Amino acid sequence: MAGYKPVVIQTYPVLGEKITQDTLYWNNYKTPVQIKEFGAVSKVDFSPQPPYNYAVTASSRIHIYGRYSQEPVKTFSRFKDTAYCATFRQDGQLLVAGSEDGVVQLFDISGRAPLRQFEGHTKAVHTVDFTADKYHVVSGADDYTVKLWDIPNSKEILTFKEHSDYVRCGCASKLNPDLFVTGSYDHTVKMFDARTNKNVLCVEHGQPVESVLLFPSGGLLVSAGGRYVKVWDMLKGGQLLVSLKNHHKTVTCLCLSSSGQRLLSGSLDRKVKIYSTTSYKVVHSFDYAASILSLALSHQDETVVVGMTNGILSVKHRKSEAKKESLPRRRRPAYRTFIKGKIYTKQRDDIVVTRPAKKHLEWYDRDLKSFRISKALDRVLEPNCVIKTPEVTVSIIKELNRRGVLANALAGRDEKEITRVLNFLIRNLSQPRFAPVLINAAEIIIDIYLPVIGQSSVVDKKFIVLQGLVEKEIDYQRELLETLGMMDMLFATMTRNGSAPVWEHVPAELPEEKTESPRQPSDTDKNS
């Protein structure tokens, strides 16, 4: 008796993900470390100087974390209400933050009590930053004002009242100590010059502005609000360079890579998009478990920190290069160990015995071998098999149809079992690689269960969905046939006209008397 031949699972080519340099670069991070904060993480900012600690603003506290620590190395909690936008100075020695009560506080990293308190805003301060000269602080608040403060004298220098709604974001120029940019819920982004009493540039974003970013060169400005990220050319008077719409929800934060070649944006849709600053196309993306409020990159992009609405801080560190450890040298086996048995000369009376390799059958093959056809079909309709390896399910259905027992395997099923079969058909019927097998299976199911249609509302809904899917597929086929007909007509026209293009009409030769030009009257005719 011949042995059982396992079912051949038909394999299909799978298009792999395109591997780029950005994919390799941004995937080279370890598993993220998650830290639970006391509230939503509204701001994350890295110190520009070693050891590159980062400040996390959440609830009424500011935590300073070491680059690789999971516990804060310092905490600032001298806030009466919610703290906002803790930002390091360029030398990493000072930290400035706003608060819900409108007070701007300046801290020394080595101390705990605030060095300075700037009081002048009447509502919550959501954005603060140091100017390029390190001696001034810019702040924007919900009282629609932007203020410039002097650190040594603890005094207010200028107040700009040109926004008509909350000022929620801003940044100072890294090159010019007199220039800074603010974004507001009045849909505008404005650039101010401390040497004047009004804005020197204003652009219309079109949505409430949640974040702004000024390139280190000062030539480009990025604004984020709504689902849009817009890039403006400041050297051309604020001309819109490109408008990006790659998020599904509001964009809340922006960040620039260390090299300045990649722009990162975080959104409430739980995604971080990475754009090329030359083509402004998405080159990579990260997915997170909750909506994103803040985002920061450390020096040389070694660490990515993301703050979320649920108070979770996600920290990812770049993988270190594997170092080859010098292992003790093993003693090599003697030469006779390798040639043992290879130089044996077969004798005439020797009998060679080969041990056949034992083949292990899959569970569905064991069921088919024992003629348990319904059990075999049930095994390949399990959720794990249906989702991960649908080609196995299709191959078993094809094998049952080849044996002529597919109708027997599908018959006699209850509501739950037939629903699983219909769900698989709905999921995969429109795929060209599975369609020939599944269409036949669908016809058999309809023939078997047609007399009992109407007895189960769940099964009836599945049949209605299957009917709609088939009708949609028929419409697609009709459109394809119409397209093929038009293409055949075009090809026929090209063949009939020879080398003439399709869009050129080559007229047939006309009789000679119709093509000659009218005779010009002679001088004799004119005189007569």
Swiss-Prot record:
It is found in: Nucleus, Nucleolus. The keyword Chloroplast does not apply. SMART domains: WD40. It comes from the Eukaryota. One of its GO terms (biological process) is positive regulation of transcription by RNA polymerase I. The modification N-acetylalanine is found at A2. Keywords: Acetylation, Isopeptide bond, Nucleus, Repeat, rRNA processing, Ubl conjugation, WD repeat. GO terms for cellular component: endoplasmic reticulum; fibrillar center; nucleolus; small-subunit processome. There is a cross-link at K249 (Glycyl lysine isopeptide (Lys-Gly) (interchain with G-Cter in SUMO2)). Pfam families: UTP15_C (PF09384), WD40 (PF00400). Signal peptide: none annotated. Residues 508-528 are annotated as: Disordered. Part of the small subunit (SSU) processome, composed of more than 70 proteins and the RNA chaperone small nucleolar RNA (snoRNA) U3. May be a component of the proposed t-UTP subcomplex of the ribosomal small subunit (SSU) processome containing at least UTP4, WDR43, HEATR1, UTP15, WDR75. Interacts directly with UTP4 and WDR43. This is U3 small nucleolar RNA-associated protein 15 homolog. It comes from Rattus norvegicus. The gene is Utp15.
